[in-house]
Amino acid sequence: MAGLPTNSNVLERQRLEQQRQEQQRIDALKHFGQLFKQRQIEPSADARAHWQQVLQLGFPGSKHEDWKYTPLERLFAHEFSFPHAPDVTTAQCDALSLVPNAHRLVFINGQFSPTLSDRECGPYQLTHAAENVPFPTAIQSEVFLHLTESLAQERLHIRLPVGQHSDKSLYLLHISSGNDSDMVNTSHS
């Protein structure tokens, strides 16, 4: 019967689609590799080790059990870049804050802003981690964890000591810049 799809036509389309998706994952790895090289500071040994894990694991495909229902192709269709920090005022932070009575820490494009954050955070302890301080061991190692850790350029550890309680909640205000292009900013600058 002419015009009806045959098993070989269906299988060929599936094979071509799998090849397209595999190429998309390879291209995404190359793009993130360029971002890794564009970091503003030299990557630590820990960041380089995480990047090697990204390369070793690769991005999961549709047959990967944990990711089979997650359409990563839409994520890979975007271009990512490190954003430039916009000028943000305290008044703008106040207008964007949803929780008025809290210890507020402000992050602009993923970078901690001490000038816009509350100076006093009650019992919460803030520590800026140097690049040479190793990351804590991952609970579950996976490619996006390693990608995040390899691109991170600044780390802030927030800790509430055992037995301590705060009269106010801790509010993390993340402000991200954007533009009209299809470029997606990473929040690791």
Model-predicted regions and their roles:
Residues 2-189:
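Glycine-rich and polybasic anion-binding loops at the starts of cofactor/ligand-binding domains
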